[in-house]
Amino acid sequence: MDKAAFRTAFGAVYEHSPWLAEEVFDTGVDAILVDADALNARFESVFLAAGKPRQLAVLQAHPQLACARAEQTELTAASRREQTGAGLDQCTEAEFNQFIDMNEKYMNKNNFPFIIAVKGRNRQQILEAFKSRLDNDTSSEFQTALEQVCQIAKFRIKDILRG
């Protein structure tokens, strides 16, 4: 697989950040292309070594939760599938308003959106996690967001390799 094909296949693993796929490719990926765990570890290593400014840019590229219901156009296909799979497109009006309010508070406080790997969770679990993290300090949330982005990437890599 050449670099362009790798970027096409894996460029959306980290939200709106195809540069990560390019840098992962440059580390040499031929031996790990069929091993989801090894490929994920390589992506995670490159992401965590990228430095705080680039990490923050990746976090800021993530959509706010429940935006699938709001029909936001900047939502990637992967994010739309994930949010829809968690039922975030089926929020009641009250739940939707909670997400809108918490999204705004969280973003104003931290300068990046609330990020959680929604796969395998329902909207009530996501709302509870959101509520429990609202009062955390920004440094803790930055670390948690990095972990969650890596978890999202792991799910996406596995999905891509399953075909």
Question: Where in the sequence are the language-model features?
Answer:
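Charge-rich, low-complexity N-terminal segments
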Residues: 9-32
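Amphipathic alpha-helical interaction elements
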Residues: 12, 29, 47-48, 115, ...
